[in-house]
């Protein structure tokens, strides 16, 4: 058996380990999905419209939450959720050290400070004891990530956050089908952001969804996601009336 640990790396002229290109994202797209996309193109509703509303309703019912709001990405969902939860410049938001950069970037986007804490070796999820040690008077939100679909310990995090008035925002980018003690991801925090990027197990190419049980949060995110316009896009051309600008 050849000892390949002594060979030079492929970038240095050595023999590549793989003979075929490793595809970054390989979604299972079948005829049903292709036909659904074609129907959407033929209908003319390429952006926010009836099919998006249908998707929101189906996703809400699947997760088991009161509200689901479609957004352009999970990153946008995290960003909007942080604002909806009242995070402002100077505040601190606790995030895990093992996560995609968007988790921390969303915090930076609102002018707050991401505080990275250690993860558990066994689960790769945020360590509740590390979270508790990192809390300061400026802590406003904790953002647990369900890493690789394994649920973060929301029970422990709730016990830490709720008595202190700290909000919980689930980064559920990996969290479709994730369940923690009988509760689905997207129902355990104040709100949650899901990803439908090409590498996820439910995809829309790009795209995301925010779920919440709070009607005020859902309404704000829906309006803010449409640049503050308060009339649903698909109602502009309906019998309910014309589009008005103020």
Regions found by a protein language model. Name each.
Residues 45-92, 105-110, 115-118, 183:
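Phosphate-binding glycine-rich loop
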Residues 1-46, 50:
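N-terminal "arm"/small-domain region of PLP-dependent enzymes with the aminotransferase-like
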Residues 49, 75, 97-98, 151, ...:
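Alpha-helix N-cap/helix-start capping motif
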Residues 175-181, 188-246:
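Active-site region of PLP-dependent enzymes
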Residues 83-172, 179:
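PLP-dependent aminotransferase-like
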């Amino acid at each position: 058996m050849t000892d390949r640990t002594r060979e030079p790396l492929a970038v240095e002229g050595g023999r590549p380990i793989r003979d075929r290109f490793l595809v970054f994202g390989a979604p299972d797209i079948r005829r049903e999905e292709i036909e659904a996309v074609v129907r959407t193109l033929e209908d003319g509703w390429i952006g926010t419209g009836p099919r998006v509303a249908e998707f929101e309703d189906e996703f809400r019912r699947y997760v088991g939450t009161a509200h689901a709001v479609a957004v352009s990405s999970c990153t946008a969902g995290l960003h909007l959720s942080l604002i909806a939860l009242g995070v402002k410049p100077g505040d601190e938001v606790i995030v895990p050290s093992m996560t995609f950069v968007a988790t921390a970037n969303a915090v930076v986007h609102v002018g707050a400070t991401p505080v990275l804490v250690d993860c558990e070796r066994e689960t790769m999820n945020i360590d509740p004891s590390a979270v508790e040690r990192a809390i300061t008077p400026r802590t406003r939100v904790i953002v647990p990530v369900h890493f690789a679909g394994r649920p973060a310990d929301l029970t422990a995090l709730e016990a830490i956050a709720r008595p202190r008035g700290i909000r919980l925002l689930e980064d559920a980018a990996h969290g479709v089908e994730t369940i923690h003690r009988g509760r689905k991801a997207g129902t355990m925090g104040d709100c949650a952001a899901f990803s439908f990027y090409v590498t996820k197990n439910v995809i829309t190419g790009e795209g995301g969804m925010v779920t919440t049980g709070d009607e005020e949060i859902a309404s704000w995110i829906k309006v803010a996601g449409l640049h503050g316009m308060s009339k649903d896009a698909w109602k502009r051309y309906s019998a309910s009336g014309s589009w008005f600008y103020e």
